[in-house]
């Protein structure tokens, strides 16, 4: 059944791929620059450019904060990538990353009303990336880091947050973590379990898996174990990077070892940001009753929803729009930046992330919650405003 699905899915992907390639050629890029002001006369020209433009320049020179009043800075984000970890394509470089970053800019505008520009850097050197972003930051109200490989992404984000006084947000980490937590909050209501009592397995110890684990712990989960392709991660695991070593101080506190199958025995929640088809029905059967599974590998999840349900799972989410419970970052990052920009936040804090997750979860009315309805729709017009208000309420 799984093999048949994969074959059907690959045929669908081929059809989508052909259409996407054709349309991208027709569009010749997905975004454009549209002026807000008209330049139809000499007077228009004199105000929009010289000599009139000198006046706001002088005001900003006297106080840099006035750039928020007189320029696009107040509602503009840089979408920065080095092309080192793009979707499932891997390290494809700056030019090849452009269609993804353009797409991200489209989503910022369509879902959050935020202007965004793709900035694809022809370097994968940590120091060069940091220096470049610092140097271009005056033009932007926020920095969205995208598709930068781990563990470099952790250092790049951390140092940029220290160096800049505008929000810096690695969406592959935190956007994913926020939507996962929001889904789990609602899934727990469906299965009538408490976070403190749940055993959680996160499979995939890269940027997304680590950020998910951190946010789950901050929310109040006590028993979280990280796994990767080698199995359960513990303090004795070999070849851990520096961030994974840090995570061993707060996860798998009993020092358990073994395979993913071993980890899932008696687990209540599985979150997969890993590889297709690696969770079997037998593994799901070994989990606790009414298990929650978020199988988010794309385009083929760790286990298909129907197989997971057949094996006893109660709530199943994926990253895809053709199954119930799509766990998609688009319900998070536009509203998060909208709120951060409108509130002139200097950083996006852990409190803001938790508030965003709770706000997203709250968009599904409790009377409408069920095993196939735990997430708001990406096209729900309330999402960005509700998330932005939650973020603004937590700016200090």
Descriptions of predicted regions:
Residues 1-13:
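Short, Lys/Arg-enriched N-terminal segments with co-localized hydrophobic residues
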Residues 11-166, 388, 394:
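N-terminal ligand-binding/catalytic initiation module
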Residues 87-89, 153, 176-181, 203-214, ...:
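Short glycine/serine/threonine-rich phosphate/pyrophosphate-binding segments
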Residues 92-109, 178-271:
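Glycine-rich phosphate/diphosphate-binding loop of Rossmann-like nucleotide-binding domains
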Residues 171, 295-396:
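Adenosine-phosphate binding glycine-rich loop
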Residues 245-314, 320-322:
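Rossmann-like adenosine-cofactor binding region
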């Amino acid at each position: 059944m799984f093999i048949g699905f994969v074959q059907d899915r690959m045929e669908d992907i081929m059809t989508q791929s052909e259409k996407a390639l054709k349309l991208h050629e027709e569009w010749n890029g997905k975004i454009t620059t549209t002026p807000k002001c008209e330049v139809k006369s000499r007077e228009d020209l004199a105000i929009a450019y010289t000599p009139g433009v000198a006046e706001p320049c002088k005001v900003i020179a006297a106080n840099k904060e006035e750039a928020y009043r007189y320029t696009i800075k107040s509602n503009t984000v840089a979408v920065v990538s080095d092309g080192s970890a793009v979707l499932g394509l891997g390290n494809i470089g700056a030019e090849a990353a452009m269609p993804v970053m353009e797409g991200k800019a489209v989503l910022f505008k369509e879902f959050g009303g935020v202007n965004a520009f793709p900035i694809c850097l022809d370097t994968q050197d940590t120091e060069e990336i940091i220096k470049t972003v610092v140097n271009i930051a005056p033009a932007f109200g926020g920095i969205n880091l995208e598709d930068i490989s781990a563990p470099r992404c952790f250092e790049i984000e951390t140092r940029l947050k220290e160096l800049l006084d505008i929000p810096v947000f690695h969406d592959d980490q935190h956007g994913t973590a926020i939507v996962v937590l929001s889904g789990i909050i609602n899934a727990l209501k469906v299965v009538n379990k408490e976070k403190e009592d749940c055993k959680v397995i996160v499979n995939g110890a890269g940027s997304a898996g680590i950020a998910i684990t951190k946010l789950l712990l901050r929310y109040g989960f006590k028993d979280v174990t990280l796994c990767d392709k080698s199995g359960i991660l513990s303090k004795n695991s070999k070849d851990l990077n520096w961030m994974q070593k840090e995570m061993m101080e707060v996860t798998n506190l009993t020092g358990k070892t073994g395979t993913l199958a071993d980890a899932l025995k008696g687990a209540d929640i599985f979150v997969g940001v890993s590889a297709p088809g690696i969770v079997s029905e037998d593994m799901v059967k070994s989990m606790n009753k009414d298990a929650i599974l978020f199988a988010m590998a794309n385009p083929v999840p760790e286990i298909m929803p129907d197989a997971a349900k057949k094996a006893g799972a109660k709530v199943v989410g994926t990253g895809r729009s053709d199954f119930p419970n799509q766990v998609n970052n688009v319900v998070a990052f536009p509203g998060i930046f909208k709120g951060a920009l409108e509130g002139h936040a200097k950083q996006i804090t852990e409190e803001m992330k938790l508030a965003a997750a709770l706000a997203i979860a709250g968009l599904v009315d409790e009377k409408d919650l069920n095993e196939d309805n735990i997430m708001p729709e990406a096209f729900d017009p309330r999402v960005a405003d509700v998330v932005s208000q939650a973020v603004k309420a937590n700016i200090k």
